[in-house]
Amino acid sequence: MDFSIIQYSKFMTLLAMSLQNLKTLHMSLEESIKWLGEVMAEIGPTHSQKSEDWNIFDVKQANAIIDYLKISLFQHYKLYEFMFYSAREEIVIGTEQVIEVVKSACGPFPNPLEEGISFDIYSTFIEPPTILDTEMKRLDQEQGPEESQPETDTSDMDPLVGFTIEDVKSVLDQVTDDILIGIQTEINEKLQIQEEAFNARIEKLKKA
């Protein structure tokens, strides 16, 4: 059935009113059928003020609307009543997750939530100072600048003072020779092992 835009609007209004009567006014099936008959009876050749909102449908269209309401709303009226009136149990579907974290320790490793921080930043700004570090700082402050001055002077001294260039060269030559001799010995041992393995394979091939 082809309807115009205004007819579609009125038809949707009729459907909404039918559901509203069931949901709000708690009309029974007999009362809803009676109400629909009264509304459809207003569709006719008379053009009174009361029926001017519904007289846009002819008799054929009105019969099509009634047939549709029979197979949709009225046929499943009990189902609509159950949907509007019956209280339904709310089923909440959820899940529980148990997360076990590592217990904090006094070691050098940060807690699990702080593993993304570099160790330098963690040890400087987050990790509390240990008892040993606190005692060392306190002893350094008690000793004063007089005792720390010779250490500073000693650390500033050149470790090569008292050695000539020839002494340094001789030491470097000796260290280099020792390293090269060790490498050469290791290479010779590996070559000897490979040679023995090849000889053993050749002997097996000869016997075969």
Curated annotation (Swiss-Prot):
Name of the gene encoding the protein in the UniProt record: CABCOCO1
Keywords, in A-Z order: Calcium, Cell projection, Cilium, Cytoplasm, Cytoskeleton, Flagellum, Metal-binding
Disordered: annotated segments: 139-159
UniProt cross-references to InterPro entries, sorted A to Z: CLAMP
Keyword Cell inner membrane: no
Protein purpose: Calcium-binding protein. May be involved in the control of sperm flagellar movement.
Compositional bias of kind Acidic residues: 143-156
A Pfam family assignment: CLAMP
Keyword Manganese: no
Molecular function GO terms recorded: calcium ion binding
Locations listed in the record: Cytoplasm; Cytoplasm, Cytoskeleton, Microtubule organizing center, Centrosome; Cell projection, Cilium, Flagellum
Organism: Homo sapiens (Human)
Cellular component, GO annotation: centrosome; cytoplasm; sperm flagellum
Record-given protein name: Ciliary-associated calcium-binding coiled-coil protein 1
Main location: cytoplasm
